[in-house]
Amino acid sequence: MELKLDRNKTYGLALEGGGAKGAYQIGAWKALREAGIRFSAVSGTSVGALNGAMIVMDDLEKAENVWNNIHFSQVMDVDDEEMRRLMNRDIPLSELKSTLRSVADIVRNRGFDVTPLRKWVAEVVDADKVCHSDTDFFIVTYSLTDHQELELKASDLDKDELCDMLLASAYLPAFRLEKLGGKYYADGGVQDVVPIHALVENGCKDIIALRIFGFGIEKRFRIPDDVHVTTIGPTVDLGNILNFDAEQSRQNMRLGYFDAQRVLYGLYGSSYYIDRTMSEDAARQQLLEYLGPDEGSLRTFHEKTLPQIAKALKC
């Protein structure tokens, strides 16, 4: 298969925010990495910033392990089974009262406690490696205290500041508001959910945007004529932004991997992908020859053979 991107170039990688949908980006990164695509800069909003840190670390094994084994209580102080049932709308009548009580407690406490997420960031992210990487890394967040959007460069931060700003970038509206470094922050998606701007401002001419269609606002700005953006994104719904379920994440990683393959090699399809190496007329003629003289007429082919194939494939 012919690669549609240039291995001789280095690209900027923009990672959209979208909570639990983020597993998709790691699958896409795996395909890009296998294809030999290199990055001079990475930018991330929300979960895109957390994934971006692992990409800058170039630790695919860790990133896959994180998403293969993700569960709700790693991100929020909640009961995993209760959250799974809530996400799947599978709550037995006998447990409805206790579940509603738990939801009421979360509302009363003004959101989910994100102490587990803080711990997760500290355990997963090698802050020293990220801060001193040869790959520029930009974190997008929003300071509620200063009413200001921030595009922060990791090399300008110390290790503690980096972890705080990764958490700040991923501060979803459902999370309980707490100060980080003396200030309040909101998820970067409130101003720029697809952080292409940070890459353009820092001189990237070739950019790959990994979309997951999360919650937030796409920043409006003019992309210069000499900047080219390649987009990789899903054609199916990746699920709820709070559905931190391992099975869903594994499925989303697979989707990300194959969607990236589709873009990388110009493949056709949405649920499956094929390499289109011949024209439609040539493919039809080859099929007619394969079927033999009994199916040789175009009328028989269109009225009988094609409907049978479509039925077998459930098209």
Regions found by a protein language model. Give the residues of each.
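Patatin-like phospholipase
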Residues: 1-45, 53-315
